[in-house]
Amino acid sequence: MFKKSPLNVTSEIGKLKKVLLHRPGHEIENLTPDLLERLLFDDIPYLKVAQEEHDAFAQTLRDNGVEVLYLHELAAEAIQEDEIRKKFIEQFLDEAGVIGKGARQVLKEYFADMDNETLIRKMMAGVRKKEIPAIEKVASLNDMVEEDYPFVLDPMPNLYFTRDPFATIGTGITLNHMRTETRNREVIFAEYIFSYHPDFKDTEIPFWFDRNETTSIEGGDELILSDKVLAMGISERTDAASIEKVARNIFTDGQPFETILAFKIPEKRAFMHLDTVFTMVDYDKFTIHAEIEGPLKVYSITKGDNDELKIDEEKATLEDTLKKYLGLDEVTLIRCAGGDYIDAGREQWNDGSNTLAIAPGEVVVYNRNHTTNRLLEEHGIKLHVIPSSELSRGRGGPRCMSMPLVREDI
């Protein structure tokens, strides 16, 4: 007998009750300048300070009544059974590209005596070759060819951006297929949590998207504007075809959602996901990066006849489109740093538009984006300001670093 889904997120701004985070770990200290591009980082955060900043973020949430869960703990609890643990290790090594016979065997032996939490942390951190016994060079050609590479298992430094590998929508999730091989490895943790964790395994959680799909989607491109309207980004990381798949699944499942607004944003690093340039902070207020307003196209996706999708390009301004679909008389777009070319460019690079709402009109923001923060306050938004000198080096803000599991309905 399946139990009711323990998930419930029907807005961006409903009071946040439960959230999933990942505290940065030793994966950050396995970054080197030579590996930054491969691992999708622009800089190397100082781990000690990054952890202090992340702890301040988590405490801010707790102080406001939010239950904070951690990714490594849930993942460890999901693989308690021996057969599931063995399956998890084999799949993890497959997805990490550990194909050399020697490397694979040595890693399995290395993992064998670890408890589950230590195992998960080590998988996240990556394994340097000098940590393990020498790989027999006769084991495989692949092992010999890769002998100069410092890792037998790459680190996963993007994990503290828990927003992207999966996304809670309503009572279900999209289990995402991420654009890059580096980040697609992260999805395995969510896969096992929702399949095998005691809190989730026997519950009715619909999957709006499956990670085995061939097109890409990432959680930073998935926003819930109301219990009837979703916003999704067609971006550097999310394909239009993926949005159509989500739409078909949601519209045929009896969920309350009636419309998906698909935002086509420029494909560039600074605008990686929709939530780096557009977030909801109150019933009728949104942050936006002014640079996307010109080239922005918005398409509405609704349920058509015979279970087909009806797709139209919205010709009105963004304000009018939002008013139309959200049933609002007025909409306020709060431009990152007021739209000033220099200030907005700087603050958007440090996620000035990437806010996390914990209640209507109440958001968590980075302290470094002082111009945008002042504008938010001038528009009546209550701010919870967190330190950000090191966390921001990963190119993600408070929304990127959090995956809501439960919000109050509004």
UniProtKB/Swiss-Prot annotation:
<comment type="pathway">
    <text>Amino-acid degradation; L-arginine degradation via ADI pathway; carbamoyl phosphate from L-arginine: step 1/2.</text>
</comment>
<keyword id="KW-0378">Hydrolase</keyword>
<dbReference type="GO" id="GO:0019547">
    <property type="term" value="P:arginine catabolic process to ornithine"/>
</dbReference>
<dbReference type="GO" id="GO:0005737">
    <property type="term" value="C:cytoplasm"/>
</dbReference>
<dbReference type="GO" id="GO:0019546">
    <property type="term" value="P:arginine deiminase pathway"/>
</dbReference>
<dbReference type="Pfam" id="PF02274">
    <property type="entry name" value="ADI"/>
</dbReference>
<keyword id="KW-0056">Arginine metabolism</keyword>
<feature type="active site" description="Amidino-cysteine intermediate">
    <location>
        <position position="400"/>
    </location>
</feature>
<protein>
    <recommendedName>
        <fullName>Arginine deiminase</fullName>
        <ecNumber>3.5.3.6</ecNumber>
    </recommendedName>
</protein>
<dbReference type="GO" id="GO:0016990">
    <property type="term" value="F:arginine deiminase activity"/>
</dbReference>
<dbReference type="InterPro" id="IPR003876">
    <property type="entry name" value="Arg_deiminase"/>
</dbReference>
<keyword id="KW-0963">Cytoplasm</keyword>
<comment type="similarity">
    <text>Belongs to the arginine deiminase family.</text>
</comment>
